[in-house]
């Protein structure tokens, strides 16, 4: 298989280095494009080689199996940058732009609407796909549209917020094989930057004081079964501190599973399934993960049921 040197492809790259849980096997081929043109060239090559392709951002909502991923894995975290108009409140950001960076830049420009996201360890692309949210806010509230790439054809197009069919931690992109390249947001202009700075600082303090930032995690593991909170249900059943291998239900926030230092992806998967089973037995509720599994897991169908 001929690999063009200008694609900067690497072989057998451990993917745990590119997820916030720090677990997962290797990718057959791996690349971090630094421009949209580079990404499109990678997709063109992968399509020509008939390789399965996976796309990741900051890796904060992913559980990659210990066996790794076949084919080509493309990480968008180097596709950074944003442009904003302080008059109209419109801001456009590349898929790999860290969400906290975008939130702080908007706040400094007097643009309100992303303060809730300052503590989320993800990228714009991942946030658009997952309809990320916190502190009562979410991506869908301010998104105008997203520019997406269809890997099967190499074509790009814009999808409006309505087309993305947003719901709680859901978008149409979770079931469509499309890749976010950039996104546009409409924020409230003309707000005092010092007021916005105070809001972002307050939101960040709330997250860092109640969530386990000192250990690798993926963020919230389960969606909240409205009107209840997943973390409260899990804590109420005495599962804080429960371990399987190196995976542990956080003693600080029960909707977080942390890597205590030597966890495998299989440990994370098993603990997720254990928590689901205990909650189901006690309350008759099925907790649905926010985290997306990639690769092969034992009993994966049971876990997703």
Swiss-Prot record:
It catalyses: UDP-N-acetyl-alpha-D-muramate + NADP(+) = UDP-N-acetyl-3-O-(1-carboxyvinyl)-alpha-D-glucosamine + NADPH + H(+). GO terms for biological process: cell division; cell wall organization; peptidoglycan biosynthetic process; regulation of cell shape. The active site is at residues 169, 220, 290. InterPro entries: FAD-bd_PCMH, FAD-bd_PCMH-like_sf, FAD-bd_PCMH_sub1, FAD-bd_PCMH_sub2, MurB, MurB_C, MurB_C_sf, Oxid_FAD_bind_N. Its main location: cytoplasm. Residues 22-190 form the FAD-binding PCMH-type domain. One of its GO terms (cellular component) is cytosol. SUPFAM superfamilies: FAD-binding/transporter-associated domain-like, Uridine diphospho-N-Acetylenolpyruvylglucosamine reductase, MurB, C-terminal domain. GO terms for molecular function: FAD binding; UDP-N-acetylmuramate dehydrogenase activity. NCBIfam families: murB (TIGR00179), PRK13905.1 (NF010480). This is UDP-N-acetylenolpyruvoylglucosamine reductase. It comes from Synechococcus sp. (strain RCC307).
């Amino acid at each position: 298989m001929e690999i063009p040197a200008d694609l900067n492809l690497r072989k057998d790259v451990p993917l745990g280095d590119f997820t916030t849980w720090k677990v997962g096997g290797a990718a057959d081929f791996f690349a971090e494009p630094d421009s949209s043109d580079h990404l499109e060239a990678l997709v063109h090559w992968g399509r020509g080689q008939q390789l399965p392709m996976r796309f990741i951002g900051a890796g904060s909502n992913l559980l990659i199996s210990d066996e790794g991923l076949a084919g080509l894995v493309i990480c968008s975290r180097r596709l950074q940058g944003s442009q904003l108009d302080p008059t109209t409140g419109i801001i456009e950001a590349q898929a790999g732009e860290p969400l906290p960076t975008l939130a702080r830049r908007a706040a400094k420009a007097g643009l309100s609407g992303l303060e809730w996201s300052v503590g989320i360890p993800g990228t714009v692309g991942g946030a658009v796909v997952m309809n990320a949210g916190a502190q009562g806010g979410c991506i869908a509230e301010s998104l105008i549209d997203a520019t997406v790439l269809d890997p099967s054809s190499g074509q790009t197009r814009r999808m409006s917020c309505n087309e993305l069919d947003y719901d709680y931690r859901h978008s149409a992109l979770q079931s469509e094989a499309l890749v976010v390249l950039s996104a546009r947001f409409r924020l409230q202009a003309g707000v005092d930057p010092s007021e916005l700075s105070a809001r972002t600082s307050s939101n960040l303090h709330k997250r860092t004081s109640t969530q386990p930032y000192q250990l690798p995690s993926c963020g919230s593991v389960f969606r909240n079964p409205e009107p209840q909170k997943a973390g409260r249900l899990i804590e109420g059943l005495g599962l804080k501190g429960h371990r399987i291998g190196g995976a542990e239900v956080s003693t600080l926030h029960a909707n977080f599973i942390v890597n205590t230092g030597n966890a495998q992806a299989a440990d994370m998967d098993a603990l997720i399934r254990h928590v689901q089973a205990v909650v189901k037995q006690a309350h008759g509720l099925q907790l649905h993960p926010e985290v997306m599994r990639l690769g092969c897991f034992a009993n994966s169908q049971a876990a997703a049921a």
